[in-house]
Curated annotation (Swiss-Prot):
Full protein name: Calcium-binding and spermatid-specific protein 1
Positions of modified residues (Phosphoserine): 312, 344
Modified residues (Phosphothreonine): 280
Subcellular localization: Cytoplasm; Mitochondrion inner membrane; Cell projection, Cilium, Flagellum; Cytoplasmic vesicle, Secretory vesicle, Acrosome
Length: 388
């Protein structure tokens, strides 16, 4: 290489110009200076030898001279140089910006405030691992009146940039009161010299909680202890000796009674009404339509019987003379034999048939119907008491 930077020109040019190669090598020194690239071509007769396999040794220190080293030693020296450069580069970056590796972490810590179950969120701000000691402020969301200080020692490695702290602060607890909603705490961060991380949690006693009041349980009342309902019994039996006695009700006069007369006996009713009896499986499944027809027929028959009873109730009008004869005959029939008793019955029926009025004459006697001796007089009751 000439002094002016141009390559040297030899009198005999190289025989094989295609084998000529160039290489630019860049070195980074401790002073961050970049040397110039050099291209050297040597010639020994017709054979051209390049300097690509050799390089100048540079150990970033004062050297007495330059030596050519083989490729294996050169690779080893390059590895050493790279590791040395990384250390120096990291040192320079730490000096220029010492807070580059710092990070901010936020942790939400639950806070026990006496007997209140609500929690306060705490944010952890400006947590650094590169500084030996640093005070970290713990702020709560809702500021209050009182402050409580908490000191905890936490140690960690300077290589890691994040850390987590989970400590429960000590809060003053008053029985039945919990008015502390704000507190500030300073955490001292200490890094030991050996670089080992040890986390020490401060022991915090649990806040005492007032016991909850016991629930008042209501006992279920016993069914057998209920008071029995009062049932009023009314005796409506009339004395036989005095026909003028009117029954007196022991209950209030507002209550009304309905007298129901059954025209058929229980045996005939069960025979005429098959729906009262239990049905077999075949009747309930196969003969439903037949049962419905029977039900409709029975309803018509029952209604007809009731209507005839209501219409014919006013036809039984008996004069007073006939009633007196009936009572006398009934008393004498008890002493007569059976033959004479049958004759007296036929005689009484003939007299009744002769004294029974026609339907046309009944309309004229409708007004004085209640005054004559009829069905209601035989029952010793007034008609208004039974009709509603």
């Amino acid at each position: 290489m000439a002094e002016d930077g141009l390559p040297k020109i030899y009198s005999h040019p190289p025989a094989e110009s295609t084998k000529t190669t160039t290489e630019a090598t860049i070195f980074f020194g401790a002073d961050n200076t970049i040397p110039k690239s050099e291209t050297t071509i040597t010639s020994e007769g017709d054979h051209v030898t390049s300097v690509n396999d050799y390089m100048l040794e540079n150990d970033f220190s004062t050297t007495t001279g330059n030596k050519l080293i083989p490729p294996k030693e050169r690779q080893k020296s390059e590895d050493d140089v790279e590791s040395h450069l990384e250390k120096e580069f990291a040192t320079l970056m730490d000096i220029k910006n010492p807070m580059a590796n710092e990070s901010i972490t936020e942790n939400f810590l639950p806070v026990k405030t006496g007997n209140i179950s609500s929690t306060d969120a705490i944010s952890l701000i400006d947590f650094s691992t590169d500084i030996a000691k640093e005070d970290i402020l713990l702020d709560t969301i809702d500021p209050g009146d009182k402050d409580v200080s908490l000191t905890s020692e936490v140690s960690g490695t300077p290589k890691e940039s994040t850390a987590a702290i989970a400590d429960t602060p000590i809060l003053p607890n008053i029985m039945g009161k919990s008015d502390v909603s704000n507190y500030s705490s300073s955490v001292k961060f200490k890094v030991p010299a050996d670089g080992n991380a040890h986390i020490t949690d401060s022991s915090v006693p649990e806040a005492e909680i007032t016991p909850t009041t016991e629930r008042n349980l209501t006992t279920i009342p016993d069914i057998t202890a209920l008071t029995e309902e009062k049932i009023t019994e009314i005796d409506l039996i009339l004395p036989e000796n005095d026909p003028n006695v009117v029954p007196k009700l022991t209950d209030s006069d507002e209550e009304k009674f309905i007298t129901v007369f059954e025209l058929t006996t229980t045996a005939e009713r069960d025979k005429d009404n098959p729906e009262d009896a239990l049905l077999t499986d075949e009747e309930s499944t196969d003969e439903v339509s037949v049962w419905m027809e029977r039900d409709m027929a029975n309803e018509e028959e029952s209604h007809s019987v009731l209507l005839t009873a209501v219409e014919s109730r006013y036809d039984f009008v008996i004069p007073a003379s006939v009633t007196m004869n009936l009572t006398e005959d009934l008393l004498t029939e008890e002493d007569l034999p059976e033959n004479n008793r049958m004759e007296s019955v036929t005689k009484n029926t003939d007299e009744l048939s002769g004294t029974t009025p026609d339907l046309d004459a009944f309309s004229h006697k409708e007004d004085n119907f209640t005054t004559e001796t009829g069905v209601f007089k035989l029952l010793k009751e007034e008609p208004d008491e039974f009709l509603i």
